């Protein structure tokens, strides 16, 4: 702006001086000289002066044109300079804006680099965790498989033992029915003998004594049944505690949680869907399993009690009843000799032997049996429960008369359980 003012002031000053110079040239005193003397001598001088004036005017015109050209160029240069200054100011502003943008971008880039480093560290940590979870999932799957195998073995053992107990129950129920029939026959014979030998008071007293002994033995059997019931309940609770079903359920729940976590980490939708279905049905499965275990334990307890009803019957001494010979009845001499040799309970082969065979004591799946032919394998020995040394609850299997020993087919498959099945000969 100052350069434009200078050019305007210089042009305004140049114009009046030029006009004054031209007026002075026109009002020169050389034109007013009219004397003749001077015209002759000074004509040359005048001409030379006129020539000089013309040259000066030409140079003045040239200078004016040059000055005007220079002024126009100066104006153009000043306008360009003003435009350049404006552009310079704009560029400075743009430069400042770009610098601020660059600083912001640089800060953002540093933040992104920091975030990238944090994300890379987190990625490495998550990768390590994923590797650990994969290893843990493999280990848990192996543990789950081993537990399922143990559970299958125990189920097979339990089923085989339950089958053997059912066979024992059927066998002893048949024996008891036979004994009841024989007792009924003996009661009929006793009533007949009482009618025939009503006069014999000594025989009646002996019969009453035997009946009292029999009643005492029945009471003893009831007390023994109550004791065995308590002992069986203790054995069942002890076996269930060592079976530790709740720990298996907790292990199953832990495995399901690990599988779901691993599937979420790996984004496995199919596995998550199947696992959610398993988790949704887990309560029903657990309740069904608990009910099955409870019913099996109760049935085992009932079978054990029914099979031990006639286990510890005391031998009863029989008193021979002798008939007083009747001299008037000659036809009964042959029968009297047979009646003299007949015992009161000689009709029962089991009672006449003096003792009743003991049945197999009830044991739960996995209980070590001393009557086993083979030694338990390493896989089944871990699940076996060591029984106590109480003789009344000893898990040894005794074979009653009329029962043959047969090895279950599960012994050949698994090699860790041998069950004696009863077969009536």
UniProtKB/Swiss-Prot annotation:
Domain of life: Eukaryota
InterPro entries, alphabetized: She3
Effect ascribed to mutating residue 361 to E: Prevents correct localization of ASH1 mRNA
Keywords from the UniProt entry: Coiled coil, Endoplasmic reticulum, Membrane, mRNA transport, Phosphoprotein, RNA-binding, Transport
Its membrane topology: Peripheral membrane protein
Modified residues (Phosphoserine): 343, 394
Protein localization: Endoplasmic reticulum membrane
Compositional bias segments (type: Polar residues): 35-45, 345-358, 382-397
One GO cellular component term: cellular bud tip
Described purpose of this protein according to its UniProt entry: RNA-binding protein that binds specific mRNAs including the ASH1 mRNA, coding for a repressor of the HO endonuclease. Part of the mRNA localization machinery that restricts accumulation of certain proteins to the bud and in the daughter cell. Required for the delivery of cortical endoplasmic reticulum into the emerging bud.
Family assignment from sequence similarity: Belongs to the SHE3 family.
SUBUNIT field: Interacts with SHE2 and MYO4.
Record-given protein name: SWI5-dependent HO expression protein 3
